[in-house]
Amino acid sequence: METIIEVKNLVKNYGDKQILKNISFNINKGEIISIIGESGAGKSTLMRCLNGLEGINSGSIKFYDTDITKLKEKEKNSIKKQMAYVFQDLNIIDNMYVIENVLVPFLNRKNFIQVLFNQFSKQEYERALYCLEKVGISKLAYTKAKYLSGGEKQRVAIARSLAPNVDLILADEPISSLDEKNSTQIMEIFKRINIKKNKTIILNLHNVEIAKKFSDKILALKNGEIFFYKKSAEVNEDDIRKVYQTS
């Protein structure tokens, strides 16, 4: 299988505190990977490093065959256009229509005048509507985002991540504020995207049972280190207990 992410000996510090310690793992194209662990284990930091939002102190992160940690900012931005990041706080703009929120990624490809006057092409609008249809909220395209529920806003964020037709989607705690029903629906959307479009998806999740149900593999972090990285079907109750066990 083709490797899309290769991490070797990654170290990340904040000042004198080491957040990630000698992290190494591979992710194959088309896999769903869930990252689990206690709060403060380094999950969100790892996600941001993988996307290039955070620099690292040592080690390497390869996207396909390119080490993104050695790129200049312009080159890094070109690579990041092949990735989408669903932030924990979603970054949905309440006073914009749903479809306008989904169109936001296309702004990076436009000049100042086009951005100023929201000049989007017919193809971009069609792509945005297509993505909203895939997450089941195309009827809300011309609704102001401030009127949406939490679950609907999460769907908008996922649709926005699909709009640029990227290879890799990273979602930081995409279901943390949702009830069980909405959490399952959101994970089913990720699974459909994964199966039908062969997208690689990396998720930061607190719900271990949902992680096991919808992921191909689970990467468990503990105190900034990899505690285990294995197929979801191989993860047992003892593994989970040890991840969340305090010494």
Curated annotation (Swiss-Prot):
InterPro entries: AAA+_ATPase (IPR003593), ABC_transporter-like_ATP-bd (IPR003439), ABC_transporter-like_CS (IPR017871), ABC_transpr_PhnC (IPR012693), MetN_ABC_transporter-like (IPR050086), P-loop_NTPase (IPR027417)
Pfam families per UniProt: ABC_tran (PF00005)
Entry's Gene Ontology cellular component terms: plasma membrane
Molecular function (Gene Ontology), one example: ATP hydrolysis activity
Limits of the ABC transporter domain: 5-246
Gene: phnC
Family (UniProt): Belongs to the ABC transporter superfamily. Phosphonates importer (TC 3.A.1.9.1) family.
Catalytic activity: phosphonate(out) + ATP + H2O = phosphonate(in) + ADP + phosphate + H(+)
Entry membrane topology: Peripheral membrane protein
Binding site for ATP: G37, E38, S39, G40, A41, G42, K43, S44
Keyword Membrane appears in the UniProt entry: yes
Keyword Zinc set for record: no
Quaternary context: The complex is composed of two ATP-binding proteins (PhnC), two transmembrane proteins (PhnE) and a solute-binding protein (PhnD).
Signal peptide: none
EC primary class: translocase
Enzyme Commission number(s) of this protein: 7.3.2.2
Keywords: ATP-binding, Cell inner membrane, Cell membrane, Membrane, Nucleotide-binding, Phosphonate transport, Translocase, Transport
Superkingdom to which the source organism belongs: Bacteria
This protein's name: Phosphonates import ATP-binding protein PhnC
Biological function: Part of the ABC transporter complex PhnCDE involved in phosphonates import. Responsible for energy coupling to the transport system.
Subcellular location, record wording: Cell inner membrane
PANTHER family cross-referenced by the UniProt entry: AMINO ACID IMPORT ATP-BINDING PROTEIN (PTHR43166), PHOSPHONATES IMPORT ATP-BINDING PROTEIN PHNC (PTHR43166:SF4)
